[in-house]
C-alpha cells in the first residue's frame, strides 16, 4: 500500500470588507470538494485560508462606519466564518492576514528579497489629498472626463463614454474621499525586480503547474516583457509597515498570498504533527496547491512564485484556476435578484443543493460557470432526490417490514455490482483532475442503472406474490448496497447526505475503499427522508430577498468574480447596451515607433500601423515603459474611431488599450499571435 500523500491546499483569501456571495462560494466549494476527496482516500490533506484584511478600502470603510479597521475585520471574519461553515466548507484553519504570523513572514520574505538585491526604490508622482494627508489611488479621484466632459468620473476611466486615461488628464480633479482638490506629489516607492525571474517563470509556468489555457496567457505576458512591481504604499494605510522604512507599507497584494503561509503556521502551533518547513522549505517534497479565480492569475503565477524563489522558499505544485459565475446566463445582477449573498441563499435553501449543482458543472478548465436557477431546481430534484435517495427509499421499507431491518447475504445481480466496482477508478481520476462534472455524470449513470434494475424487478409487485419474499429481500439488499456505493462516490460533494446515510446504514464513517465491499447480514436503522425536493417558490423568495437586501445595503457592483481579485478592489463600470459597444471600432495595431514626448511626464508618442494607414497616438504609459523602444514591433489593440484630440504636443488619433491600476502597473494589451495590423477586434 502506497504512503499517504501530504498535501497543503489554499483558496484565495476573501476580502474583509463585505459579505461573500455565490460567486465567491464557487471557489470555496470547489476546493472543499477536492480536499474532502483527498481525505476520503486516506491522504493527509490540510486546507487553510484567511481573510485578506489590509488595504485602503478597509481603512476607509472602517472610518465611514466609525469603528477601527481591527473591529471591522473582526466583524467580517465572524460573518465569513459562519457562511463558510454553513456551506460545509471545512477549513483546517481560517485565519487573517492581519496577524503576528503574517507580519513576521512578510518581513522575513521582504528582507530576504532586499538583501539578495531584488528590491529597488525610485520616486513616483501621484495625486495627494491635502485634507486627508494621503496619496490617492486612481479610483479615489473623480472629475470631468477629458474625452466627453461627463462629470463625476473616476480617475482612470469614464463610465459614460468608456474612455481610459491617466488621472492627470482628468479635468477639475477632486478627491473622492474628502472632496478636496488633489495636488501632485513625489514619493519614494519600493519595487520588486520581477524581470530578474523571467527565465525561471518561463520554465515553471510550462512545467505542468498551470492549465494549458492559463500557461498560454502567462506566456503572452512573459513574451511582452515583465515590469518591476510596486510593492509599497504610503501612510496612512492599513497594513504592515516595511522594515526599516517608517511611513511605508506593504501593498496588500504582497502580504495577501503570504497569508497562506501565515494561516498554516498558525495551525502548526496547535498541531505538533505538522512541520512548517516540510511544506514551505525550499526542498519540501510535500504538495502545495492554490485554487484561485482567473482574475488573479498574474499574482499567483508570476509575482508569487518569483517572490518565493527570491526568498529561497518552495513554489506551488499547482495553481488551479476557475472561471467566473453567471446566473441565468448573465452576470449577477441586483435588479434581477441574482446577486445572491451566501447568507441569503442559506436562509432559503440547503447548502448541499448548490454544492451538487456546482459539482455537476465544474470541469477542469477556466470557463465561466452558469447557475441557471430553473436547471438548478430540475437537476437537484431529478438527480439527488429522484435517483440517489430514491433507491434507499424504495428498498428500506421492504427490508424492515419483511426481515426486521436485516440485509440478507445475497448478491442478486453480480454484473451490476461489478459495474459499480469497475467505475470507481474513473470517478476517482475525475475527482483528482478536478473534473467534478465528469465524476457526477459517471456517478449518476450508475444511479440510473440501479434505478432501472429496481424498476425492472419491482419489489413492490413481488411482495404481493406468494413465495417471492426471498427475492424481494435479495433485490432490496442489493438496492441498499448500490445506494451505499453512490453515497461513497458522492461524499466529497454531499457530506451531510453521507452522514445521514451512515446513520441509516448503521455504519462507521464511509471511506473511499469501502466501495470494494458489500453489506451482508447487516442491521439497518429505520429509514427517514434524507432529502426533500426544492420548491421553486423558495428560489423565487431567495431572488426577491436578494433584490431587497442588496438594493438596501450592498455597495458591490454586479460583477461576480469567484475569487477575491481586482474586481473586488476596482469595481466594474455601469452597464452599456450593445449598440454603445458596437459603436467602438477596435483594431489591431503594430507599433512602428515609440518615443518620449519632450515636456510630458507621463506620455509616450506611438506611431501605429493599422493596415492601410498610420496613426499618431499619445498614451499615458511612460511610467510603465521607461524604455519605449522595447515596444517597437509589438502588436497592440486600439480604439480606431475615437475623435482626434488636439494636445499640446500634437494630435492624438486614437487610444491604445492597457490594463492595470496605473503608475508602474500598466500593461499594454496585445492580441494573440497571428493577428494582423488593421484587423477588427470583435
UniProtKB/Swiss-Prot annotation:
GO terms for cellular component: cytosol. The keyword rRNA processing does not apply. ATP binds at residue 334. Residues 580-682 form the tRNA-binding domain. It is found in: Cytoplasm. Its cofactor is Zn(2+). A motif ('HIGH' region) lies at residues 14-24. A motif ('KMSKS' region) lies at residues 331-335. It is an enzyme of class 6 (ligase). Its EC number is 6.1.1.10. GO terms for molecular function: ATP binding; metal ion binding; methionine-tRNA ligase activity; tRNA binding. Zn(2+) binds at residues 145, 148, 158, 161. Homodimer. Belongs to the class-I aminoacyl-tRNA synthetase family. MetG type 1 subfamily. Is required not only for elongation of protein synthesis but also for the initiation of all mRNA translation through initiator tRNA(fMet) aminoacylation. This is Methionine--tRNA ligase. It comes from Pseudomonas syringae pv. tomato (strain ATCC BAA-871 / DC3000). The lineage of its organism: Bacteria, Pseudomonadati, Pseudomonadota, Gammaproteobacteria, Pseudomonadales.
Amino acid at each position: 500500500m502506497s504512503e499517504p500523500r501530504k498535501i497543503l491546499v489554499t483558496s484565495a483569501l476573501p476580502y474583509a470588507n463585505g459579505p461573500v456571495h455565490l460567486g465567491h462560494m464557487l471557489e470555496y466549494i470547489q476546493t472543499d470538494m477536492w480536499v474532502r476527496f483527498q481525505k476520503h482516500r486516506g491522504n493527509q490533506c490540510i486546507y487553510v485560508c484567511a481573510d485578506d484584511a489590509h488595504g485602503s478600502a478597509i481603512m476607509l470603510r472602517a472610518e465611514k462606519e466609525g469603528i477601527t479597521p481591527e473591529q471591522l475585520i473582526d466583524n467580517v471574519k465572524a460573518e465569513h466564518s459562519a457562511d463558510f461553515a454553513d456551506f460545509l466548507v471545512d477549513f483546517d484553519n481560517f485565519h487573517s492576514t492581519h496577524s503576528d504570523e503574517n507580519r513576521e513572514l512578510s518581513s522575513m520574505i521582504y528582507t530576504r528579497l532586499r538583501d539578495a538585491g531584488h528590491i529597488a526604490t525610485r520616486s513616483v508622482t501621484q495625486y495627494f489629498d491635502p485634507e486627508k494627508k494621503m496619496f490617492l489611488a486612481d479610483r479615489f479621484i473623480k472629475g470631468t472626463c477629458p474625452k466627453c466632459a461627463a462629470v463625476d468620473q473616476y480617475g482612470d476611466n469614464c463610465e459614460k463614454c468608456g474612455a481610459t486615461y491617466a488621472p492627470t488628464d482628468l479635468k477639475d480633479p477632486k478627491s473622492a474621499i474628502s472632496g478636496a482638490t488633489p495636488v501632485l506629489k513625489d514619493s519614494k516607492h519600493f519595487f520588486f525586480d520581477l524581470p530578474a525571474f523571467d527565465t525561471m517563470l518561463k520554465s515553471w509556468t510550462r512545467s505542468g503547474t498551470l492549465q494549458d489555457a492559463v500557461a498560454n496567457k502567462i506566456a503572452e505576458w512573459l513574451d511582452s516583457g515583465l515590469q518591476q512591481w510596486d510593492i509599497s504604499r504610503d501612510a496612512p494605510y492599513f497594513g504592515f509597515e516595511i522594515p526599516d522604512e517608517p511611513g511605508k507599507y506593504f501593498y496588500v497584494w504582497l502580504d495577501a498570498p503570504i497569508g497562506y503561509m501565515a494561516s498554516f503556521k498558525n495551525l502548526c502551533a496547535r498541531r505538533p504533527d505538522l512541520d512548517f518547513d516540510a511544506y514551505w522549505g525550499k526542498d519540501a517534497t510535500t504538495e502545495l496547491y492554490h485554487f484561485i479565480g482567473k482574475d488573479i492569475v498574474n499574482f499567483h503565477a508570476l509575482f508569487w512564485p518569483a517572490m518565493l524563489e527570491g526568498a529561497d522558499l518552495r513554489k506551488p505544485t499547482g495553481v488551479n484556476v476557475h472561471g467566473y459565475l453567471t446566473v441565468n446566463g448573465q452576470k449577477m445582477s441586483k435588479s434581477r435578484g441574482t446577486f445572491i449573498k451566501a447568507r441569503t441563499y442559506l436562509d432559503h435553501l440547503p447548502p448541499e443543493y448548490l454544492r451538487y449543482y456546482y459539482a455537476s458543472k465544474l470541469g477542469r478548465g477556466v470557463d465561466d460557470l452558469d447557475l441557471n436557477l430553473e436547471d438548478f431546481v430540475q437537476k437537484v430534484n431529478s438527480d439527488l432526490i429522484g435517483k440517489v435517495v430514491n433507491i434507499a427509499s424504495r428498498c428500506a421499507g421492504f427490508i424492515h417490514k419483511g426481515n426486521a431491518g436485516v440485509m440478507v447475504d445475497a448478491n442478486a445481480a453480480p454484473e451490476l455490482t461489478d459495474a459499480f466496482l469497475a467505475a470507481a477508478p474513473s470517478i476517482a481520476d475525475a475527482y483528482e483532475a478536478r473534473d467534478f462534472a465528469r465524476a457526477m455524470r459517471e456517478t449518476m449513470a450508475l444511479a440510473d442503472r440501479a434505478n432501472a434494475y429496481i424498476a425492472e424487478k419491482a419489489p413492490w409487485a413481488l411482495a404481493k406474490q406468494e413465495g417471492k419474499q426471498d427475492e424481494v429481500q435479495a433485490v432490496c439488499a442489493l438496492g441498499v448496497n448500490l445506494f451505499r456505493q453512490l453515497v461513497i462516490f458522492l461524499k466529497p460533494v454531499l457530506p451531510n447526505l453521507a452522514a445521514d446515510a451512515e446513520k441509516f446504514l448503521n455504519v462507521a464513517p464511509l471511506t473511499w475503499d469501502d466501495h470494494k465491499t458489500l453489506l451482508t447480514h447487516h442491521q439497518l436503522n429505520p429509514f427517514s427522508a434524507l432529502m426533500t425536493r426544492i420548491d421553486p417558490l423558495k428560489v423565487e423568495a431567495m431572488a426577491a430577498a436578494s433584490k431587497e437586501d442588496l438594493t438596501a445595503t450592498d455597495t458591490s457592483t454586479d460583477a461576480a468574480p469567484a475569487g477575491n481579485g481586482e474586481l473586488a478592489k476596482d469595481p466594474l463600470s455601469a452597464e452599456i447596451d450593445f449598440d454603445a459597444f458596437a459603436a467602438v471600432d477596435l483594431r489591431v495595431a503594430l507599433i512602428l515607433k515609440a518615443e518620449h514626448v519632450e515636456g510630458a511626464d507621463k506620455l509616450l508618442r506611438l506611431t501605429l500601423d493599422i493596415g492601410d494607414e498610420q496613426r499618431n497616438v499619445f498614451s499615458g504609459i511612460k511610467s510603465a515603459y521607461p524604455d519605449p523602444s522595447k515596444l517597437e514591433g509589438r502588436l497592440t489593440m486600439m480604439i480606431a474611431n475615437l475623435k482626434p484630440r488636439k494636445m499640446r504636443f500634437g494630435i492624438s488619433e486614437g487610444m491604445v488599450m492597457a490594463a492595470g491600476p496605473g503608475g508602474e502597473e500598466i500593461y499594454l494589451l496585445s492580441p494573440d499571435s497571428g493577428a494582423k495590423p488593421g484587423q477588427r477586434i470583435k
